[in-house]
Swiss-Prot record:
It comes from Mus musculus. Residues 350-391 have a biased composition (Polar residues). Its main location: membrane. It is found in: Presynaptic cell membrane; Postsynaptic cell membrane. Residues 333-349 have a biased composition (Basic and acidic residues). This is BTB/POZ domain-containing protein KCTD8. Keywords: Cell membrane, Cell projection, Membrane, Methylation, Phosphoprotein, Postsynaptic cell membrane, Synapse. The gene is Kctd8. The modification Omega-N-methylarginine is found at R80. Auxiliary subunit of GABA-B receptors that determine the pharmacology and kinetics of the receptor response. Increases agonist potency and markedly alter the G-protein signaling of the receptors by accelerating onset and promoting desensitization. Residues 44-122 form the BTB domain. The modification Phosphoserine is found at S78, S413. The lineage of its organism: Eukaryota, Metazoa, Chordata, Craniata, Vertebrata. Interacts as a tetramer with GABBR1 and GABBR2. One of its GO terms (biological process) is protein homooligomerization. Residues 331-412 are annotated as: Disordered.
Length: 476
């Protein structure tokens, strides 16, 4: 900055750009009209005040993109820049050109104007706002560079740096391999078709499946010096490694994320740990979420010579690896068919059970006069049309149904009599159990039981002294 005398005793503050232009042409006026070979009304070094942030750049840098907003503002040949001149552009109190935009994001716009390349820091959270700034300054190529990345961020809720894209590619390939392995290991049937539909259909993989690893460094500590044998497990911290979405789903608020904050849910981390130190509590949470342990390993930690203590000797590092398989994806139509099939199986098993309870007789009605010996042709025809009878044990829904050959048929009159006799016997037994004896009857029963006790007149001689003393005491 410098002071310029106006001749009337006052002075004005000049920016660096005015000093450069004044030193290059000291005798020329500042607002001279540009002729065909007249110099540019803008200085070679331009000072900008963008949203309170001061930037100093070359005039040629602002004109590097011809169709941009900055080129139209600072180009002397454009209607906006040449006709209005630099005196018409807004300035701040220090005579710097003022642009009312985001001053923090303008540094990336200015970097792009210098070399036409976009270099953003890792985990940059302002991509959408930077896209708006690029659209305002009419930087078409910069908009094209930012648009697919913002779309990727919106669709996957992911950051689009190069390392993040590699993480997404590796994650997608691992999910595809996982689903292929599940499809190869599944038996032929509805389960295999469900998995193959997910892999071949190109739909999104199951985000609920995946691995979680728990690791901890455990040691044993003694209670007191005189109780050296009493050692107890001591766990300083339980580390959690795996996909962030799975870890948050299982552990929730008990997960400490201070060591690796601001990570997207679909990313992986190895820096989370739990707020509690009880392994069994972590196992319970994983079991409730559907995880099961697939592998574990442990190794001892070596101690230095000068730190040869019990807590260093009795220490180890252990890892437990848990896995939750992908869930079976069933269409509504297939689910409806499975329910109908299950209902039919239940009805068949119930009818088979009822037939077996009825003395394993036939469910078809026959007249009393007809017997298997009288008409063997009718018997064979009825046996051909009658389904086999189910066993008493109700089969599971997915297990094959076991059939038994039809039993010999009896007359309905005999069946009716057997049913009546059975019902009477069950009613009598229930009544006997449900009856309660009165107090008088209980006393009579006790007296009768006491009378049944038989005391011998004489007891054999006992060799032991205490036995003979006991008999003499009671005069037996």
């Amino acid at each position: 900055m410098a002071l310029k005398d106006t001749g009337s005793g006052g002075s004005t503050i000049l920016p660096i750009s005015e000093m450069v232009s004044a030193s290059s042409s000291p005798g020329a006026p500042l607002a001279a009209a540009p002729g065909p070979c007249a110099p540019s009304p803008f200085p070679e070094v331009v000072e900008l005040n963008v949203g309170g942030q001061v930037y100093v750049t070359k005039h040629s840098t602002l004109l590097s993109v011809p169709d941009s907003t900055l080129a139209s503002m600072f180009s002397p040949s454009s209607p906006r820049g040449g006709a209005r001149r630099r005196g018409d552009l807004p300035r701040d109190s220090r005579a710097r050109f003022f642009i009312d935009r985001d001053g923090f994001l303008f540094r990336y716009v200015l970097d792009y104007l210098r070399d036409k390349q976009l270099a953003l820091p890792e985990h940059f959270p302002e991509k959408e706002r930077l896209l708006r700034e690029a659209e305002f300054f009419q930087l078409t190529d910069l908009v094209k560079l930012l648009s697919p990345k913002v779309t990727k961020q919106n669709s996957l809720n992911d950051e689009c740096c190069q390392s993040d894209l590699e993480d997404n590619v590796s994650q997608g390939s691992s999910d595809a391999l996982l689903l292929r392995g599940a499809a190869a290991g599944a038996p032929s049937g509805s389960g295999a078709h469900g998995v193959s539909g997910v892999v071949g259909g190109g739909s999104a993989p199951d985000k609920r499946s995946g691995f979680l690893t728990l690791g901890y460094r455990g040691s044993y500590t003694t209670v007191r010096d005189n109780q050296a044998d009493a050692k107890f497990r001591r766990v300083a911290r339980i580390m959690v490694c795996g996909r962030i979405a799975l870890a948050k789903e299982v552990f929730g608020d008990t997960l400490n994320e201070s060591r690796d904050p601001d990570r997207q849910p679909e990313k992986y981390t190895s820096r989370f740990y739990l707020k509690f130190t009880y392994l069994e509590q972590a196992f319970d949470r994983l079991s409730e979420a559907g995880f099961h342990m697939v592998a574990c390993n442990s190794s001892g930690t070596a101690a230095f010579v000068n730190q040869y203590r019990d807590d260093k000797i009795w220490s180890s590092y252990t890892e437990y690896i848990f896995f939750r398989p992908p869930q079976k994806i069933v269409s509504p139509k297939q689910e409806h068919e499975d329910r109908k099939r299950d209902k039919v199986t239940d009805k068949g098993s119930e009818s088979g059970t009822s037939c077996n309870e009825l003395s394993t007789s036939s469910c078809d009605s026959h007249s009393e006069a007809s017997t298997p010996q009288d008409n063997p042709a009718n018997t064979q025809q009825a046996a051909a049309h009658q389904p086999n009878t189910l066993t008493l044990d109700r089969p599971s829904r997915k297990a094959p149904v076991q059939w038994m050959p039809p039993p010999d048929k009896r007359r309905n009159s005999e069946l009716f009599q057997s049913l009546i006799s059975k019902s009477r016997e069950t009613n009598l037994s229930k009544k006997k159990v449900c009856e309660k004896l009165s107090v008088e009857e209980e006393m009579k029963k006790c007296i009768q039981d006491f009378k049944k006790i038989h005391i011998p007149d004489c007891f054999p001689e006992r060799k032991r002294q205490w036995q003979s003393e006991l008999l003499q005491k009671y005069g037996l």
